Amino acid sequence: MTQQRQMHLAGFFSAGNVTHAHGAWRHTDASNDFLSGKYYQHIARTLERGKFDLLFLPDGLAVEDSYGDNLDTGVGLGGQGAVALEPASVVATMAAVTEHLGLGATISATYYPPYHVARVFATLDQLSGGRVSWNVVTSLNDAEARNFGINQHLEHDARYDRADEFLEAVKKLWNSWDEDALVLDKAAGVFADPAKVHYVDHHGEWLNVRGPLQVPRSPQGEPVILQAGLSPRGRRFAGKWAEAVFSLAPNLEVMQATYQGIKAEVDAAGRDPDQTKIFTAVMPVLGESQAVAQERLEYLNSLVHPEVGLSTLSSHTGINLAAYPLDTPIKDILRDLQDRNVPTQLHMFAAATHSEELTLAEMGRRYGTNVGFVPQWAGTGEQIADELIRHFEGGAADGFIISPAFLPGSYDEFVDQVVPVLQDRGYFRTEYQGNTLRDHLGLRVPQLQGQPS
């Protein structure tokens, strides 16, 4: 009998006030204890209890102030990224109380040097026993650039060109220690074999790194590379490097097209498509009945202030939408931008979310509920499991990012009400079968790449 293909599950939430659901901090059941290490440890324990493959934390390097060029909305109303703790530090906190759960952190390949990034993730991978993933981003806008002493953010495709070289340099550093370089022969007084530790001497268009790294090779070979860029250039980057991809898609049809497109990019890059796992995000809202779950979803979305959504949308598109009255039709804003020849992603967002006929306020509220793309599913545990299985069998993804409606309770509900159904139906593990994140995802250990000594 053919063995049932297994679904992968990942948690995704900000180390701060909100993630996709911008009103989540106002939810009556939200603890808002996001400055406490115990808060993150509770979530990590919950996801490990549910046998999740991993969790990972996004990051942004600036408070959102594109909307109105001030902090009134982004901070005053609790916008996305108003509070954002450094993800790698939070991952270390969670690693200390878990044994199997994979742990991912986002660090920009644009604003940090490759030696620092390689060392951070190699350290986390050693301390966690090989459970770490790096979510590679190239950052978003000029606000982030200014926090690093740079006036203007690099152009989109140039950021990915630089990131290609950045990954090359980081991987060289991760490979600068052979598997058996650490000797620890007390009697002979030999700590390590210097012939098996290598300079990398990377000299490229963007970066220069000598090496070697000061951290021996990881228990899983290398940290898992995770990536979320879905632009054409981002997909090519994923095809070349990503071992897991985080996708945002509003419905099954778009999920299927995204899945097929990314797998094709992996194949075109000469890699095995089965060695890149694609996750798509969903936001389940659970209740003891469909009616109760729907009521809870409506309550969640009622907490979103339209200008909070517009603050994030302004940050994502680079357009100060506060320049327009809230009752302005989106189609009029798009026409104005086109007439002024202002390049923006707003056209793409509006088309993808069918928002052209909305007013600006309506668009803000919609964007603030789920950043426009994350499907919100209301139902019982059985119904949510049904939807996950339907999408999984329909070729939407290899697994799902579970975006929380509020924290920490959403994950407790999902683990208690949805995971057992998936397990009973044979779609999800009942126990971890390995120790590393690569074990969970079915990824091969990368072959050690030789370095010049």
Curated annotation (Swiss-Prot):
GO BP term, example: dibenzothiophene catabolic process
Gene Ontology CC: cytoplasm
Top enzyme category: oxidoreductase
EC nos: 1.14.14.22
Compartments (UniProt record): Cytoplasm
Claim: Secreted is one of the keywords in the record: no
Principal place of residence: cytoplasm
Phenotype seen when the gene is deleted: DBTO2 but not 2-HBP is detected following growth on DBT.
Pathway: Sulfur metabolism; dibenzothiophene degradation
Expression induction: Expressed during growth on DBT or DMSO as sole sulfur source (at protein level). Part of the probable dszA-dszB-dszC operon. Desulfurization is repressed by sulfate, cysteine and methionine.
InterPro entries membership: Diverse_substr_monoxygenases, Luciferase-like_dom, Luciferase-like_sf, NTA_MOA
Superkingdom assignment: Bacteria
Catalyses which reaction(s): dibenzothiophene 5,5-dioxide + FMNH2 + NADH + O2 = 2'-hydroxybiphenyl-2-sulfinate + FMN + NAD(+) + H2O + H(+)
Keyword terms of this UniProt record: Cytoplasm, Flavoprotein, FMN, Monooxygenase, Nucleotide-binding, Oxidoreductase, Plasmid
Family (UniProt): Belongs to the NtaA/SnaA/DszA monooxygenase family.
Job of this protein: Catalyzes the second step of the '4S' desulfurization pathway that removes covalently bound sulfur from dibenzothiophene (DBT) without breaking carbon-carbon bonds. Metabolizes DBT-sulfone (DBTO2 or DBT 5,5-dioxide) to an unidentified intermediate (not 2-hydroxybiphenyl (2-HBP)). DszA and DszB together metabolize DBTO2 to 2-HBP. Metabolizes DBTO2 to 2-(2'-hydroxyphenyl)benzene sulphinate (HBPS), also converts BPSo (biphenylenesultone (dibenz[c,e][l,2]oxathiin-6,6-dioxide)) to DHBP (2,2'-dihydroxybiphenyl) and sulfite.
Additional information: Reduced flavin is provided by flavin reductase DszD.
NCBIfam families: FMN_nitrolo (TIGR03860)
Descriptive protein name: Dibenzothiophene-sulfone monooxygenase
Protein source organism: Rhodococcus qingshengii
